[in-house]
């Protein structure tokens, strides 16, 4: 698998993305938890913000939010294992390993604590991060993402919305479907009507690589094998949220109804839910100003350089 050179480089390119699209964003590659990860960076001063993408996207999903924040924040948009231009090894797509990847990336970047934002899969991962290492995060904004404390009575009626995941999660079939990118393109257009073809290509292009197609399949399969049973059998019931958190949801989100996100219980006492009228599944692209404003609410006035990472 080929990569640009080590260190800071010019814009990382995908089919459909021009080299002049985002001139203020630098790119680097770091080793975290034994995997080479790609990160896009912008801004030179202010509190640090870490952005985690959803599926089938990568760092580029945050481009408009980065533009909103870079003037007074240091912004880092990470390509998760298997996505974008990060390495795509044959294993490690369970939430526990992905959590370790991100924490190791923070260490490699020299960031003791950050404000975290995650979209969709990145939002689900974000909840695990703030539960696993709360002292590493000054605040968390989840975008178009479920939280771990969804009551069964609210979750079960929503399961039909995820019918398409059956095409992606099973070994062999999932990789085959993902490589052909048609379902991925449908997901992107379904979630954000009017998405330009060039942006669809930017996000689906990496999935044509066999290793990345398998990574996408494994991501969904590990959710079926681990996270869904954990939630079904009360694995999050005694995990208490101690980091200030805000969940943004769109009234037109095809994958997640805002009505299902309320009533998290006392475990999620610091979680607020904010519903954005008329918005769909890709808020970082549809309403970047609103997402950036939410991040600003939870970001400290000054970088939390003195924070001590949790073990």
Regions found by a protein language model. Give the residues of each.
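Catalytic histidine-centered segment of alpha/beta-hydrolase-like enzymes
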Residues: 279-288, 292
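Conserved beta-strand termini and adjacent loop/short-helix elements that scaffold enzyme active sites
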Residues: 42, 276-278
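Flexible "cap/lid" subdomain of the alpha/beta-hydrolase fold that forms the substrate-access gate
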Residues: 10, 14-16, 20-28, 35-37, ...
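Alpha/beta-hydrolase-fold serine-hydrolase catalytic core, especially in secreted/extracellular enzymes
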Residues: 302-311
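A short, glycine- and basic residue-enriched loop/turn
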Residues: 58-59, 124, 279-280
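Conserved HGGG/HGGXW glycine-rich cap/lid loop of the alpha/beta-hydrolase fold
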Residues: 41-85
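Short strand-coil-strand connectors
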Residues: 31-33, 53
């Amino acid at each position: 698998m080929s990569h640009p050179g080590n260190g800071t480089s010019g814009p990382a390119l995908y089919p459909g993305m021009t080299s002049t699209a985002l001139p203020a964003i630098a790119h680097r590659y770091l080793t975290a938890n034994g995997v080479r990860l790609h990160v896009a960076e912008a801004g030179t001063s202010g509190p640090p913000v870490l952005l985690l993408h959803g599926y089938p996207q990568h760092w580029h999903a945050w481009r408009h939010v980065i533009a909103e924040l870079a003037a007074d924040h240091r912004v880092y948009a990470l390509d998760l294992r298997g996505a974008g231009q990060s390495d795509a090894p044959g294993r490690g797509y369970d939430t526990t390993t992905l959590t370790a990847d991100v924490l190791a990336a923070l260490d490699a970047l020299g960031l003791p604590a950050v404000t975290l934002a995650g979209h969709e899969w990145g939002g689900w991962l974000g909840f695990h991060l703030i539960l696993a290492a709360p002292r590493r995060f000054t605040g968390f904004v989840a975008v178009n993402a479920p939280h771990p404390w969804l009551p069964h009575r609210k979750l079960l009626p929503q399961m039909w919305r995820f019918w398409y995941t059956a095409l992606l999660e099973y070994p062999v079939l999932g990789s085959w479907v993902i490589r052909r990118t048609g379902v991925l393109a449908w997901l992107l257009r379904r979630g954000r009507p009017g998405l330009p073809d060039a942006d669809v290509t930017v996000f689906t292009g990496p999935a044509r690589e066999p290793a990345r197609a398998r990574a996408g399949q494994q991501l969904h399969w590990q959710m079926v094998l681990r996270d869904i049973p954990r939630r079904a059998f009360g694995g999050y019931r005694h995990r208490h949220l101690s980091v200030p958190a805000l969940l943004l949801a769109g009234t037109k989100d095809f994958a997640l109804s805002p009505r299902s996100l309320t009533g998290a219980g006392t475990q999620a006492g610091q979680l607020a839910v904010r519903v954005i009228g008329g918005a769909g599944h890709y808020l970082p692209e549809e309403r970047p100003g609103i997402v950036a404003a939410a991040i600003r609410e939870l970001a400290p006035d000054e970088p939390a350089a003195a924070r001590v990472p949790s073990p």
